[in-house]
Amino acid sequence: MSDTHLSTQKFADFPLHKEVHQALNEAGFEFCTPIQALSLPILLEKKDIAGQAQTGTGKTLAFLVATFNHLLSTPIPAERQLNQPRAIIMAPTRELAIQIAKDANLLAKHTGLKVGIVYGGEGYEVQRKVLDKGVDILIGTTGRIIDYVRQGVINVSCIQAVVLDEADRMFDLGFIKDIRFLFRRMPDAKSRLNMLFSATLSMKVQELAYDHMNEPEKVEIAPNEKTSKNIKEEIFYPSMEEKMPLLLSLLEEDWPEKAIVFSNTKHSCEKVWSWLEGDGHRAGLLTGDVPQKKRLRILEQFTKGEIDILVATDVAARGLHIADVSHVYNYDLPDDCEDYVHRIGRTGRAGQKGISVSFACEEYALNLPAIESYIQHSIPVTSYDSDALLDDIPPPVRIHRKPSTHTRNTRDRGASRPQGGQRSGPRRHDRTRRHS
């Protein structure tokens, strides 16, 4: 991991509880990222914050350190039942909740504090048994948390710390009523430490903060830069007929180690996945129709490198936090400007470099002016040579038929594999991009 995203502020300089310091040291955290350096001094004074920061900036560790330190240094309410949570961390998606829980368990090692996670889609009774045994810090999605609150499994009347992560996505997914429901059942805002983080501090997000928090201080990281300088952006103008050949040619040329291809609809994602599979790429498909267990398996394969390319819709990809994504391909330009920022923010994280490639086809090119206005810069245009596009593309596989590994060639991920992978037919060696 590159250290170029770190500040000169050390965690050791903060008056943290010794068990928190020990966990940070063992995990290899020495220097703070900017959001950590700005937010922790405020939070350690037990003041609320509303932080603006993109994913990959270290905000998760910021609110986890503050939460653990707050619970370790604050007396437990006398009326609190032993198995009831003292802190709640709410996330918009189960994948984000799972990632937060993994990070929380790193800090929990020496503290004696128990971490629990709940989310919809699976394991209702299993999760309930964990809650019955008792948790100090509850991490989860709002819908499942509310289910347990309404059934009397969870009591939030003694909550001492609250985190609302990716608040803007909470609005997008329609969870704000659920959040307000939970806030109204917690102690007064002045009686707890409140933390809100969002990629954008829109008026509706700020209104939520001021309604349910105690005069939160705003903390903003590079508020004028909606996209990271670590991401190289480029855009192509393909015809509809050349859109798929261009994508396959660029994948052949770039040969990304880990890439995400975004498309606007489930049908389009299935089409892209079918062509990638037919061309021998190790691809995974994430749409709203993918069952939760299969979804988690695909994400695990992608994280481990067993899958190289993830094809996803915006809704299905929300909350994903996967390290080392080298390329993002916008097969379709998104209709929502904020989705463009969230999409390309999957790469170029934690100080690493990333590449974003977008297609402005006839159907979605009209979205470009609004996107460029929102990100406050023009996306560099790259032309391409139609004659250099791949012309030996195999047919797509059927979406409901798992391709046989014995009848198709797949990408050889070995270090000695030739550029373009091992396929039965020759590939063109022409360069697709034409730079002026």
Curated annotation (Swiss-Prot):
Name all Helicase ATP-binding domain ranges.
40-219
What are the GO BP annotations of this UniProt entry? RNA catabolic process
Q: Do you know which Gene3D superfamilies this protein is assigned to?
A: P-loop containing nucleotide triphosphate hydrolases (3.40.50.300)
The record's section on CDD domains has:
DEADc (cd00268), SF2_C_DEAD (cd18787)
Q: Where does ATP bind?
A: 53-60
Q: Establish whether keyword Electron transport is in the entry.
A: no
**Where is the motif (DEAD box)?**
165-168
Tell me the keywords, alphabetical order. ATP-binding, Cytoplasm, Helicase, Hydrolase, Nucleotide-binding, RNA-binding
Principal place of residence: cytoplasm
Q: Identify the stretch(es) annotated as Disordered.
A: 392-436
Q: Where is the Helicase C-terminal domain?
A: 243-390
Q: Which HAMAP family match?
A: DEAD_helicase_RhlB
* Known partners and oligomeric status: Component of the RNA degradosome, which is a multiprotein complex involved in RNA processing and mRNA degradation.
Similarity comment text for this entry: Belongs to the DEAD box helicase family. RhlB subfamily.
Name this protein carries in UniProt: ATP-dependent RNA helicase RhlB
Q: Which organism is it from?
A: Shewanella halifaxensis (strain HAW-EB4)
The primary gene name is: rhlB
